[in-house]
Amino acid sequence: MALYHFSVKQVSRGKGQTVVNSAAYISGQKLYNDYYGQTHDYTKKSGVVFTEILTPEYVPERLTDRETLWNEVEKVEKSKRAQLAYSFDIALQNELTLDENIELARAFCREQFVAHGMIVDLAVHEGKSKNEDEPDNPHFHVLAPIRPFTEDGRWGNKQKREYVLDEDGNRIKDAKGKDIFNAVSTTGWNDPELLKEWRRAWTEKVNEKFRECHMAARIDHRSYKEQGIDLIPTIHEGYEVRAMEKKGIKTIIGELNRAIRQFNQMFICLLYTSPSPRDRTRS
């Protein structure tokens, strides 16, 4: 069954996170972190089937090296609470082949992220399920520096000042005589409307592929509620339950949630059905 998931968060030093570690994790590689003087080794991680760094044409070749790229990002950010990168987690489709999923991810990143001037660290994970009663979870990760790299070959500013003006166009000052201003993004990458556009664009990209393959499956970036579909909500699992389930230890709450998801999937399958990659035919 075709499923939709598209989430984005920020990798933040203020939360004790490091983007070099994040990059090592999604790529399944061993990377040295200059900022902290330590190595992050995820070479034993399984399931990473494709990685690539995509950049605008003006970005120098050195930044296509993963370790170099993310160490530069760590170095240029001076604040102890710096926001380092956007981190995307996007579901791929079991109905499609691995090669089709990879090409979808690459094309989407080029069209929606790189086209906006973003440097993209892409990693595709096959997401093999550990439980026989749960489907595989193929997905891809994207890390993108929050600070832009400019066409003149340097790391640019994240924000700029927009001064508050009066009716005559003069700057308004505060009680201390200082100009009042708002700090705004230089890129617009954090604009909620742009995120909505990315979600919609991914939906269209996947559904276009389904149509090309003569498949009835479709995804929808809208919530089930917005689509008018009533599903049974799952039960909150909490840290301990999730940790046990991750280790392959089945729990009562986990079993209940699996049953709920299975019922919901059966319900949705009445609305969206498609043949497997092996069974479909192409004209």
State where each predicted segment sits.
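N-terminal nicking endonuclease/strand-transfer module with a His-rich metal-binding environment
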Residues: 1-274, 278
